[in-house]
């Protein structure tokens, strides 16, 4: 998601000004008294990224009239958790690239990548305790527990061709939807928004997070390395079989199992068989999984009183879907 496109979707100038302040705060909070740790901990911050989760926190912060500094700190807290989890993910996956640069575990080593991830997670908790209060600290801790559960389940099913879409949904709910939901909830809470608005935007974000991950998994199979910042089809190479692959497995189990085995063994180059997972039939079935979450996310958004925020939330859903597969038929905006 390019920043220019996001700016068109979120035409609220103060949010982008706050995002600049958030970036400065992110650097401040991730700094250590040890320059070496600071360099490693800020490596992925410097590499860029969409900052989607803190943007959601800032957007949710517009639902109330709370302290702007607290709203920014809410965004920093969720981004620190996201960044810390990326450091750990790259060690788990033995990744070589992240955000278009050499991954931290390869630039330094796995031990330092784990320690830097731990440091960012600790700083998130410290910031939340100082700025946001006990309820927010508990929410962040609970969210990270869900993230770990999702990641554990993903590792459990690595290279496993016998698990199905139900397991996949549990994985992405833990790994992705939980933190996007918390981003919205934390931002709304920090703004002193009323409880109804907190609930509505949290529900929107939960389903948006599922949409986000499914569309990202489609992109992994249909986009190029320059766009992704990592090799196309990287999930398959790492033994992570996402929704399109699981659908293909269900339709032609023996054929797809052999293809995946041959790719894993190096007998077949992935790009020669990737069309088995990103053709129109597979994408159309993936779209059916999106449909329920699009409807639930948009129903939640429609309950938000602020019309400008409501329309931005609807447009964010549409953008995520359109960017992954341009000819998906999208629901009409109310």
Model regions: which residues?
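Hydrophobic, well-ordered secondary-structure elements that form the walls
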Residues: 245, 297, 313
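Short, charged, low-complexity loops and linkers
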Residues: 2-8, 102-104, 160-167, 272-280
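Conserved small/polar residues in nucleotide/adenosyl-binding loops
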Residues: 326-332
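Acidic, proline/serine/threonine- and glycine-rich low-complexity intrinsically disordered segments
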Residues: 322-324
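Mobile late-domain/C-terminal helix-loop "cap" segments
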Residues: 256-301
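N-terminal amphipathic/basic leader segments beginning at the initiator methionine
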Residues: 2-25
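Flexible, glycine/charged-enriched surface loops at secondary-structure junctions
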Residues: 304-312
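Mg2+-dependent prenyl diphosphate-binding active-site environment of isoprenoid biosynthetic enzymes
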Residues: 16-21, 27-257, 264, 292, ...
């Amino acid at each position: 998601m390019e920043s220019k496109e996001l700016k068109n979707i979120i035409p609220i100038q103060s949010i982008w000004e706050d995002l600049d302040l958030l970036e400065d705060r992110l650097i401040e909070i991730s700094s250590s008294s040890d320059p070496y740790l600071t360099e490693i901990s800020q490596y992925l911050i410097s590499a860029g990224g969409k900052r989607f989760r803190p943007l959601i926190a800032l957007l949710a912060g517009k639902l109330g009239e709370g302290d702007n500094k607290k709203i920014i700190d809410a965004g920093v807290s969720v981004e620190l958790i996201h960044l810390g989890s990326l450091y750990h993910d790259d060690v788990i996956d033995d990744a070589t690239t992240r955000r278009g640069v050499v991954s931290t575990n390869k630039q330094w080593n796995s031990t330092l990548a784990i320690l830097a991830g731990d440091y960012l997670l600790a700083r998130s908790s410290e910031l939340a305790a100082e700025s946001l209060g006990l309820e927010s600290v508990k929410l962040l801790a609970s969210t990270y527990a869900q993230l770990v559960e999702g990641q554990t389940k993903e590792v459990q099913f690595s290279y496993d061709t016998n698990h199905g879409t139900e397991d996949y949904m549990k994985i992405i709910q833990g790994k992705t939807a939980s933190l996007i939901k918390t981003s919205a909830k934390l931002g709304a809470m920090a703004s002193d928004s009323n409880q109804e608005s907190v609930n509505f935007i949290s529900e929107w974000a939960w389903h948006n997070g599922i949409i986000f991950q499914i569309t990202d998994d489609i992109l992994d199979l249909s986009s190029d390395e320059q766009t992704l910042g990592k090799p196309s089809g990287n999930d398959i190479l790492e033994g992570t079989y996402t929704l399109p692959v699981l659908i293909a497995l269900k339709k032609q189990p023996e054929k797809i199992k052999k293809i995946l085995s041959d790719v894993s063994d190096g007998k077949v180059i992935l790009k020669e068989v990737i069309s088995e997972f990103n053709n129109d039939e597979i994408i159309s079935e993936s779209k059916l999984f999106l449909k329920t979450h699009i409807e639930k996310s948009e129903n939640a958004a429609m309950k938000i009183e602020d019309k400008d925020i409501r329309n931005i939330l609807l447009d964010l859903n549409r953008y995520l879907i359109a960017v992954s597969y341009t000819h998906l038929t999208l629901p009409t905006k109310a």
